[in-house]
C-alpha cells in the first residue's frame, strides 16, 4: 500500500473512531467522555480513544519528515519535559486556581520565580494542552494540567522522567565505553552507576530514598505501561475458571517471586500477589488459593488476610511440592537478570503438571510484543521504552515473546513436554499471560 492509500485508510479509521467517541459523548457529558481516564469508563470509550491515538501516531509517521521529527523532539519532548520539572520544582500548579484564571505576575510573585520565565514556560506548555492563557498575561488550568495537581502521582512520574530516566538514558554512549574498558560485570557499568554513587544498585537506592522510590513507582504506573494487579486479574477472568476446576478441589497455587518485578517488590511482593488472589477469590467464591512467596522473610499482613487464601513460602527453583491444584499461576522473573531461572521454574512444575491431565500452568511474565505486531505502535513503544529504561538503570530487561515460546518448547522429560495452549491479551492487545499444559508424547 502506497503512502496516499495509507493516508486514506487512516482517515477512514480516524473518522470511525471519532464517530464512536462522539456517539457516547452525545449521551452524556462530552468533555468528561473525552478527558476522563478512569479505568471504570466503558470499554467502547477506551477503545475509541485508543484507536484515535493509534491512528494519530500512524499519521505522524506517514507525513513527518526529518525536520519535523527533530522539531517535535525539541519542543514536545525535551523542552516540555524540562518545563514540567520546573513547574513541579517550584510548585506552580498548586498556585493556579482550578476554576478561573490568575495573573501570571501574581503566580510569579507567590512562588518567587521570574515572571518572564514563567510566562515563556506557560506559553510553551500550552501548545501541548498543558495550562492555557485565556487572556493576555493570565494563566488557567486545562483538564490535563489540573489532573497533575489533583493526582500528585502524575507529577511524580514526570519528575522521575526528567530527573532520572532522561539523564540516565542520555548517558548510554558513556556507559558503552565504560563496559568496553572495564572487566567488571555488566551490572557495574549501567548508566545508573554513573548517576548514583559507585556500586550503588538502583533498587537499593530506591529503598534508601523514599522520594526516588515513590517517583519510580509513579513512572511505572503512569508512563511505563506496567500492568497492575487489577489488570492481570481482569485478564485472568477471560478463563473459564469453573470449568478449569470442575471435579477438583478448586485449589489454585500462585507463586510470587520477590524480585519478579521491582515495582512490586518495593510495595511488597506479598501485597501485590495476594491482591491478584483476592480479586479472583472475589469473582469465584468456590476457589481456594495458596500464595507461595519466594522470600520466607516476607510475611502476609493481617490486612491481606482472606479466609480462602493461604500463604506459604517456596524458594525459587525448588521442586513444586503443592500437588493436587487445578491451576498454577507463576509470576516469572526477568529473563535477563536470571536467564536460567525461567527454565528452572518451568522444569520444577513438570511433575505436578504430568500427574493429571487438564492441569493448567499460567505464566505472567513481562513480555515485549513481537516487533510491529500491535495495531497501536505507541503501545509497543511504551513497552520497549520501559525495557530500555530497566536496562539503563538496573541492567535488567524483559523477555521477547519469541524467547518465552522457545524456552517453553525446550522444557520436557522422557514422557512429554510443555506446550502453550493460549495467550491472554489486555485491552491494548499486549499478551499478559500465557497458559501452558503438559502434553504426553504420542506413541511411536
UniProtKB/Swiss-Prot annotation:
GO MF assignments: DNA binding
Keywords: DNA-binding, Nucleus, Transcription, Transcription regulation
GO CC annotation terms, alphabetical: nucleus
Location of the protein in the cell: Nucleus
Residue intervals of the HTH iclR-type domain: 74-144
Superkingdom per UniProt: Eukaryota
DNA-binding region: 104-123
SUPFAM superfamilies cross-referenced by the UniProt entry: Winged helix' DNA-binding domain (SSF46785)
Family annotation (InterPro entries): SAM-dependent_MTases_sf, WH-like_DNA-bd_sf, WH_DNA-bd_sf
Protein role: Transcriptional coactivator; part of the gene cluster that mediates the biosynthesis of the tetrahydroxanthone dimer neosartorin, which exhibits antibacterial activity.
PANTHER family xrefs: MONODICTYPHENONE CLUSTER TRANSCRIPTIONAL COACTIVATOR MDPA, PUTATIVE (AFU_ORTHOLOGUE AFUA_4G14580)-RELATED
Protein name, UniProt field: Transcriptional coactivator nsrH
Species whose genome carries this gene: Aspergillus novofumigatus (strain IBT 16806)
Gene: nsrH
